[in-house]
């Protein structure tokens, strides 16, 4: 009986360190921040912060701008990453093998260095402009300090992350399922909709959720590549937060 009780508590003891760290690093800051949002500087209860946020034109504009950016990045990242993962999983070409080794490379490049590299490509005097000038075309992309610049910069980070998760999910799809469906006369569209998506949709949702959460709270990329107005929500909160 004593051994049974010991084994029953063993799994909980094993996850306790990780759970404690999560509570300390994630849960406590969130609860503390929410609690402080209902207080004034002298500790009294107030709803003024929420009244200001939902009645301020600047705050609402920032919220809508952030949601537009986050949803766009999420949608593009999920679609492009899923297509990339499908290609890496089912193609046997040398190109797919090379991409399978290289697509995670952006994850190992320091974030600031990657952002400045993207900026040097998309700015009006950057690589795109110089390539166009070589063909006698004065082309200014107009991507930097704009919503499009934020989206392009974030895709650099989000696509490898989502593709990694989706590739792991697709690796669990047995080749025999696909081959049997093809032998039965199913098109690739039927295979995708009836076999692959039902087996991988949970990982797709998890990837989309992580990307959306990261974009809503993004700071570095919008700070360096975004417009002065409207601002991403993280930039606005940083500028309005008391020091």
Give the residues covered by each predicted segment.
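Membrane-embedded glycan transfer/ligation machinery
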Residues: 47-48, 61, 73, 190, ...
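Conserved short cytoplasmic inter-helical helices of the MFS fold
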Residues: 58, 95, 176-177, 188, ...
């Amino acid at each position: 009986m004593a051994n049974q009780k010991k084994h029953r508590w063993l799994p909980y003891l094993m996850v306790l360190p990780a759970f404690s760290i999560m509570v300390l690093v994630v849960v406590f800051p969130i609860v503390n921040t929410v609690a402080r949002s209902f207080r004034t500087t002298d500790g009294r209860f107030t709803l003024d912060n929420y009244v200001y946020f939902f009645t301020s034109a600047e705050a609402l504009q920032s919220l809508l701008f952030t949601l537009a950016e986050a949803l766009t990045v999420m949608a593009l990242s999920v679609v492009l990453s899923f297509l990339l993962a499908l290609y890496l999983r089912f193609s046997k070409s040398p190109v797919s093998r090379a991409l399978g080794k290289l697509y995670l490379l952006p994850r190992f490049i320091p974030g600031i260095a990657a952002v400045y590299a993207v900026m040097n490509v998309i700015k009006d005097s950057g690589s795109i402009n110089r390539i166009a000038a070589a063909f006698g075309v004065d082309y200014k992309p107009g991507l930097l300090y704009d919503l499009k610049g934020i989206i392009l910069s974030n895709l650099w980070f989000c696509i490898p992350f989502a593709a990694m998760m989706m590739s792991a999910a697709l690796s669990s799809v047995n080749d025999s399922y696909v081959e049997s469906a093809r032998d039965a006369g199913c098109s690739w569209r039927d295979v995708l909709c009836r076999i692959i998506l039902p087996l991988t949709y949970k990982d797709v949702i998890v990837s989309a959720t992580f990307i959306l959460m990261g974009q809503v709270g993004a700071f570095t990329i919008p700070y360096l590549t975004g417009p002065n107005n409207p601002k991403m929500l993280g930039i606005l909160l940083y500028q309005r937060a008391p020091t």
